[in-house]
Amino acid sequence: IMDGTAIVISPLIALMKNQVDAMRNFSEEDGVAHFINSSLNKSAIDQVKSDILSGKTKLLYVAPESLTKEENVDFLKGVKISFYAVDEAHCISEWGHDFRPEYRRIRPIINEIGKAPVIALTATATPKVRMDIQKNLGMQDAQEFKSSFNRPNLYYEVRSKTNNIDRDIIKFIKANPGKSGIIYCLSRKKVEELAEVLQANGINARAYHAGMDSATRTANQDGFLKEDIDVIVATIAFGMGIDKPDVRFVIHYDIPKSLEGYYQETGRAGRDGGEGQCITFYSNKDLQKLEKFMQGKPVAEQEIGKQLLLETAAYAESSICRRKS
C-alpha cells in the first residue's frame, strides 16, 4: 500500500457511502476509508481528519464541492497525498451525459493542495469526452486504457409507450418474481407515483430521488442492496457506482437524455455475468417534453443537449439490432 492518503473525487453521497462500506469490508480498521460531504456533522468530520492525520486512512472520498471548501483545502495541504482519483470523470465534460460544472475546478484545487499522480475513471466516454477529460485535468500525456462497450449478457428492447405502460411494467415484473430491478423515470413525481402503483399491485418496490429525506433514501438504497426490496423506482440520482451484481432488469419509463447515460444506466444489469433485460419505453411526446425542458438554458448547452437527444431518438426508432445501433 502506498504511503499517504488517496483522494477519490466522487459526485454522489450514495456512491461514496457504498464504496466506503465496501472498502471497510476488506480491513479490520474502519478508519481505512472515509468520506467528507454535507451529510456529516462537525464531530464526524473531526474524527475523519483525526484518522487521516494518524495515518489510518488510505482512501478519502470527497465531492467536488467539499474539495473546494477553503477549510478542507487548508487541511489537505498538510496531508501526504498518494494520488488523486477522479471517479465518474465524464462529469467534467460538457459533452458528457452528466455534466457538472464543479468538476471543472478539480485541477486548480489539485494544484493548490499539492501535485500527485492523477487517474480519471468512467464507464462511458466517447472520444470527444475523453479528450475533454484529459484537457480539463491537464493530463495530455496520460496513458489511456479502454475496453469494449459490448455486454453480450444484456438484452436490449425498445417498446412503444402507450397509456397501458404501468400495466405493461407490472406484467413484466410479475413474470419475473423475486428478481432485482431498477426503473428509471425522468421526474420525481412520476417516481413516487409509479412506486405507489407497484406497491398497490403487490410488488416490493420503493422510490428513490434526490428530493427525499436522506434517512428514507439511505434506507431504500440499503434495502435494495440487501435484497429486502426487489425493485427501486428512481431518477438518475440512483445507481451511479452502486455495485449490486444481480440486477436482472433495468426499465426506462421515459427516453434517456443521451446514449451514454442510457449505457451507464442499463450497465447496472447483469454485472454477475447473468442475463440482464434492458427495456426502454419510447414515445415522440417524451422527445418533445425533453426538448421543451432545454429551453431557457444557455445556447451551447441546448445545442449539445439536442444533439445527444437526437442520437437517442435514432437508436429508439432504429429497425436494426439494438446492439449494432
Residue ranges and their predicted role:
Residues I304-S325:
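Cys/His-rich short segments
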